[in-house]
Swiss-Prot record:
Record comment: activity regulation: Allosterically activated by ADP and other diphosphonucleosides, and allosterically inhibited by phosphoenolpyruvate.
Name of the protein described by the UniProt record: ATP-dependent 6-phosphofructokinase
Underlying gene: pfkA
Residues bound to Mg(2+): 103
Self-association state and partner proteins as the record states: Homotetramer.
EC number: 2.7.1.11
UniProt family annotation: Belongs to the phosphofructokinase type A (PFKA) family. ATP-dependent PFK group I subfamily. Prokaryotic clade 'B1' sub-subfamily.
Residues binding ATP: 11, 72-73, 102-105
Subcellular location(s) per record: Cytoplasm
Binding site for ADP: 21-25, 154, 185-187, 211, 213-215
Gene Ontology molecular function, alphabetical: 6-phosphofructokinase activity; AMP binding; ATP binding; fructose-6-phosphate binding; identical protein binding; metal ion binding; monosaccharide binding
Matches recorded under InterPro entries: ATP_PFK, ATP_PFK_prok-type, PFKA_ATP_prok, Phosphofructokinase_CS, Phosphofructokinase_dom, PKF_sf
Organism: Listeria monocytogenes serotype 4b (strain CLIP80459)
Length: 319
């Protein structure tokens, strides 16, 4: 192993730059050459590849987004796309690849591994929906972004004695909604993994009113329904004319938290070590504060599950 490359793919997440920095600096420390691939798998197929030096990743640790850029390239799922990618890797004499991203990125990494090219996956997505790790890079930052918004919205909800609905990201996973809702004291948390009944939500709000509570916050993951649709349905149950805030892509941006920076640094460094050990087809992660690695194929077979105990706790504490 003399030369490795790194790419970021799919939705950007705060901490991707920190992980890239760790890969580059760890690799150079170990005597390797490092190349950056712009625009993910699309850039790989197009040969958009550049050499990275120590200075290339300076002033990156605190920056959100990804300086390697990102793009979605579904054509990489085809044999033609994969063979073009391997052709470019061989052309640049690259011996191993690190891929930072979510589920779709892992599928690309798995495909390259099956074709004999050593590839390591690093979980980078704000949704925290990758198996084999307690946390993904970017989740903690997104969580704190949502919590900051929730706290500010509660101020105005209290002042005007209103119900507010906050729509957060989470197409298939409700971790952002659950963790931010618990941390922010939301009166109701609606996630894709748990069925809900509007009668139960209204009953919870009514009981709060009976105790003198004059405002409430409901956090809704986008994968369940839009915040506006939820507000429309809620309005059919009486005088709950809620205001809606859609946080949208603000959740993806911003300077990564200390947790995400440290996590990204640890995962990035470990991915280089695995390539030096000639161990491809793995995804790194963190379990109980220990860095672990698992077979990417096995990770893709597993479905991320919501922390049921945490969900139950949030329900208990929101009364």
């Amino acid at each position: 192993m003399k030369r490795i490359a790194i790419l970021t793919s799919g939705g950007d997440a705060p901490g991707m730059n920190a992980a890239t920095r760790a890969v580059v600096r760890k690799a150079i420390y170990e005597g390797l050459e490092v190349y950056g691939i712009n625009y993910g798998f699309l850039g790989l197929v197009n040969g958009d590849i550049r050499k990275l030096e120590l200075g290339s990743v300076g002033d990156l640790l605190h920056r959100g987004g990804t300086f390697l850029y990102s793009a979605r390239y579904p054509e990489f799922a085809t044999e033609e796309g994969q063979l073009k990618g391997i052709e470019q890797l061989k052309k640049h004499q690259i011996d191993g690849l690190v891929v930072i991203g979510g589920d779709g990125s892992y599928h690309g990494a798995e495909a390259l591994t099956k074709r004999g090219f050593p590839t390591i996956g690093i979980p980078g997505t704000i949704d925290n929906d990758i198996s084999g790790t307690d946390f993904t890079i970017g989740f903690d930052t997104a969580l704190n972004t949502v919590l900051d918004a929730l706290d500010k919205i509660r101020d105005t909800a209290t002042s005007h004695e209103r119900t507010f609905i906050i729509e957060v990201m989470g197409r298939d996973a409700g971790d952002i909604a659950l963790w931010s809702g618990l941390a922010g004291g939301a009166e109701a948390i609606i996630v894709p993994e748990e069925s809900f009944n509007m009668d139960d939500v209204v009953d919870r709000l009514n009981k709060g009113r009976e105790r003198g509570k004059k405002h409430s916050i409901i956090v809704v993951a986008e994968g369940v329904m839009s915040g506006n649709e939820f507000a429309k349905q809620l309005a059919e149950y009486g005088d709950y004319h809620a205001r809606v805030t859609v946080l949208g892509h603000v959740q993806r941006g911003g300077s990564p938290t200390a947790f995400d920076r440290v996590l990204a640094s640890r995962l990035g460094a470990r991915s280089v070590e695995l390539l030096l050990e000639n161990r491809g087809g793995l995804a790194v992660g963190i379990r109980e504060n220990r860095i672990v690695e698992n077979d990417i194929s096995e990770i893709l077979k597993e479905k991320h599950t919501l922390d049921q105990k945490l969900f139950d706790l949030a329900s208990i504490l929101s009364i």
